[in-house]
């Protein structure tokens, strides 16, 4: 378009968060339908709908493949770089920006936005050596991230700068976050991942949401893809001081009757003197047996 574009990056290189997202693999997008995608948006769906219609997941795939990032579609219609490296996505994107004439300056923090007649007129930046400079511009795009990961540059500057311009800032709260349980995780379970399970979120005793996929036990609670997807609702409820429970279904493909029948078959295949722990070993991961037996007071 002939516009001169300057990208001010606070860190030593752009896209620090992209490089670590998706466990370092970078889940770029998802090939679900528009309605399915928007059904996952907790608030502001109309705003997201407009953005989606301008640049949907197919457009995302086409863009990255055109700039040299081969993509693969995995289980759950998730799209990843074929290399499995988030680094490749970041570097290709930066290279493309430079090819388009974008000037990128690093170690540069935007401290203030200036206006004239209610229009953006410039910015003040602070460089790594402590010096400052005012740069004239006609447009400023705030792309600062939130306040969730200061080590990547997300320290909440965007909220402060938007507030300077008179925008209303709603209270921020965690989202896409692991959850802390009411008791520490038993050591044998730490870093253990359950796959192909269901997690049901209950708020004040009522089922609020359910997700399927992977869950990982952390030292203080649970994480993993399904927990991240449920965390927004859980956090909102916790802030409102409501009771929050997470219930796990290790066999979501089976109905209660089917599971009961399987337990009966496994039990009948064992002798009467076989410890119940041996029966559990046929139904749940071995690393969970000791804790399940202890909590259920089984021998």
Positions of the model-derived regions?
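A conserved short coil-to-beta-strand element within the FAD-binding core of flavoproteins
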Residues: 106-120
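Short beta-strand segments that buttress and anchor functional surface loops
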Residues: 122-127, 201
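Conserved N-terminal/central alpha/beta ligand/cofactor-binding core
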Residues: 10-103, 108
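N-terminal Rossmann-like FAD-binding beta1-loop-alpha1 element of flavoenzymes
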Residues: 1-7
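An anion/pyrophosphate-binding glycine-rich loop and adjacent beta-alpha core
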Residues: 12-14, 19-20, 35, 70, ...
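Glycine-rich loop(s) and the adjacent beta-strand/alpha-helix scaffold that form part
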Residues: 139-185
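Core beta-strand elements of the Rossmann-like FAD/NAD(P) dinucleotide-binding domain
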Residues: 128-139, 210-213
């Amino acid at each position: 378009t002939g516009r001169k574009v300057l990208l001010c990056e606070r860190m030593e290189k752009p896209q620090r968060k992209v490089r670590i997202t998706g466990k370092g693999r970078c889940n770029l997008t998802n090939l679900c339908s528009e309605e399915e995608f928007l059904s996952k948006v907790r608030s502001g769906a109309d705003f997201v709908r407009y953005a989606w219609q301008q640049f949907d997941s197919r457009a995302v795939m086409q863009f990255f493949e055109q700039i040299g990032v081969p993509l693969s579609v995995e289980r759950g219609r998730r799209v990843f770089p074929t290399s499995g490296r988030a680094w490749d996505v970041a570097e290709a994107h930066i290279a493309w920006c430079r090819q388009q004439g974008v000037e990128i300056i690093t170690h540069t923090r935007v401290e203030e936005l200036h206006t004239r007649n209610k229009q953006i007129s410039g910015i003040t930046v602070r460089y790594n050596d402590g010096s400052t400079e005012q740069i004239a511009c006609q447009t400023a795009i705030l792309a600062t991230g939130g306040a969730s990961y200061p080590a990547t540059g997300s320290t909440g500057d965007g909220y402060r700068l938007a507030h300077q311009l008179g925008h209303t800032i709603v209270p921020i709260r965690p989202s896409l976050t692991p959850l802390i349980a009411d008791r520490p995780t038993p050591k044998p379970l730490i870093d253990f991942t359950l796959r192909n399970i269901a997690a049901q979120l209950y708020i004040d005793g009522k089922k609020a949401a359910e997700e399927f996929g992977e869950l990982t036990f952390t030292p203080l609670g649970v994480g993993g893809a399904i927990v991240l997807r449920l965390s927004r609702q859980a956090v909102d409820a916790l802030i409102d001081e409501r009771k929050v429970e997470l219930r796990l279904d290790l066999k979501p493909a089976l109905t209660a009757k089917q599971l009961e029948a399987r337990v009966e078959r496994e039990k009948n295949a064992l002798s009467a003197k076989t410890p119940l722990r041996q029966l559990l070993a046929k139904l749940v991961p071995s690393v969970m047996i000791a804790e399940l037996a202890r909590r259920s007071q089984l021998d």
